[in-house]
């Protein structure tokens, strides 16, 4: 690689990073980045506190990617929290964070609903999730169909921990080597595209999942911006999640991804309209069709002039639209400790669980007293033996 091309890549990475993190006050925030590997969006030097989360620890990740030409194993970040069979909240020690960032991760998770709910469970009342998502139309998923509600719900009720057979079949039978530039010009020939797997290999992997529970890493879910908005809107309508779409950046020309900012809300109408707004904004003009470039530009101009769109919440600010309660109590919540840490709640005779759910979470109250006074305070709360 020449110095000039390397410089261009560096500039492109920094522009992408700035776009995905726009509005976040990294220095004053606590955040989580999932699956950073050697390309963290949030760097330790830039953040007040960043928690790197992955499915295993750093030594195992470096060993896993040692021979992968696309990953610099020596530059993989030091993982702070391992999210495996535990919940994300357990993995990060029961903390609440200002933001969660995940780049090209959401498409890999076997149970999309539970994954999103676990992200929601670690957010502060004003917290956000920033996702970068591959656009099927310009990647090796080109020939795959967009993921639908039935498959997502099936994985949810099954509590899937590994990619399900239908995901493996769709990937193995349809994933192919695709030129992004040609995809943007609409010049992909199905017959000549080189496939990643054979149907025999697909059957083998599916049987391995059913019989042995083996994890095979594939894109479980396939999206375009419009299909993503429609799917998440349906999940919100079913009260499975309560995320609104606060911001959306469509796939840029010759790019392969779109990005979405999600934030919890107590207003169901606001949530529903936010996803309808993203659906309307998403440019679904078929690439390669006659006058597609002109139609795409016209769509962009039409969306840009939509004066009826409500103003999204500003990152970090409190609004009446914000959620009323946390998804659940922190994993290490102890009523006695909470009363010891908050003597005014004890004096008021208020139920500690109800107080935390309705007030303590919003107020950022501690759930444990300082260690130096823990024993004494617990004795005061529980009374004589």
Q: In which residue ranges do the predicted regions lie?
A:
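Short alpha-helical segments and helix-capping/turn motifs at coil-helix boundaries
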Residues: 14-21, 34-38, 114-115, 246
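Conserved SAM-binding loop
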Residues: 29-144, 260-264
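Residues that flank catalytic or metal-binding motifs in active/ligand-binding sites
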Residues: 46, 255-258, 352
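Class I SAM-dependent methyltransferase Rossmann-like catalytic core
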Residues: 1-28
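Short, cationic low-complexity segments
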Residues: 274-306
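Aromatic-acidic/polar surface patches that form glycan- and anion
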Residues: 24, 104-108, 217-224, 251, ...
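Charge-rich, low-complexity intrinsically disordered regions
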Residues: 303-385
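S-adenosyl-L-methionine-dependent methyltransferase catalytic module, highlighting the catalytic core
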Residues: 71-76, 80-83, 114, 124, ...
């Amino acid at each position: 690689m020449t110095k000039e091309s390397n410089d261009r890549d560096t500039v492109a990475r920094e522009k992408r990073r700035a776009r995905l993190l726009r509005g976040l006050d990294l220095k004053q925030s606590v955040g989580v980045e999932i699956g950073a590997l050697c390309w963290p969006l949030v760097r330790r030097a830039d953040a007040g506190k960043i928690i790197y989360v992955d499915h295993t620890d750093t030594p195992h990740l470096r060993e896993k990617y040692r021979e992968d030409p696309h990953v610099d194993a020596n530059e993989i970040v030091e993982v702070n929290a391992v999210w495996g069979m535990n919940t994300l909240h357990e993995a990060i020690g029961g903390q609440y964070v200002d933001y969660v960032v995940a780049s090209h991760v959401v498409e890999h998770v076997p149970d999309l609903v539970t994954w999103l709910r676990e992200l929601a469970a670690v957010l502060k009342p004003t917290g956000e999730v920033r996702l970068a998502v591959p656009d099927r139309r310009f990647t090796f998923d080109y020939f795959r169909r967009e993921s639908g509600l039935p498959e997502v719900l099936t994985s949810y009720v099954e509590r899937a921990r590994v990619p399900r057979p239908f995901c493996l079949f769709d990937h193995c039978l349809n994933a192919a080597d695709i030129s992004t530039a040609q995809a943007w010009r609409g010049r992909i020939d199905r017959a000549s595209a080189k496939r990643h797997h054979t149907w025999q290999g697909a059957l083998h992997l599916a049987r391995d999942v059913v019989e042995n529970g083996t994890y095979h890493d594939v894109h479980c879910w396939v999206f375009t911006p419009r299909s993503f908005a429609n799917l998440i809107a349906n999940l919100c309508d079913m009260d499975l999640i309560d995320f609104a779409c606060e911001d959306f950046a469509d796939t840029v020309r010759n790019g392969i991804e779109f990005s979405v900012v999600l934030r919890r809300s107590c207003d169901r109408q606001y949530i529903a309209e936010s996803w309808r707004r993203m659906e309307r904004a998403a440019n679904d003009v078929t690439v390669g069709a006659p006058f597609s470039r002109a139609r795409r530009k016209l769509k962009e101009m039409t969306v840009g002039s939509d004066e009826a769109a409500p103003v999204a919440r500003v990152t970090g600010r409190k609004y009446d639209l914000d959620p009323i309660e946390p998804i659940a109590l922190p994993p290490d919540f102890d009523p006695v400790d909470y009363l010891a840490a908050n003597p005014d709640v004890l004096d008021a005779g208020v139920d500690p669980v109800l107080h935390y759910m309705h007030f303590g979470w919003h107020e950022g109250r501690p759930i444990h007293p300082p260690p130096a006074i823990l024993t004494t305070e617990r004795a005061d709360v529980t009374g004589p033996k």
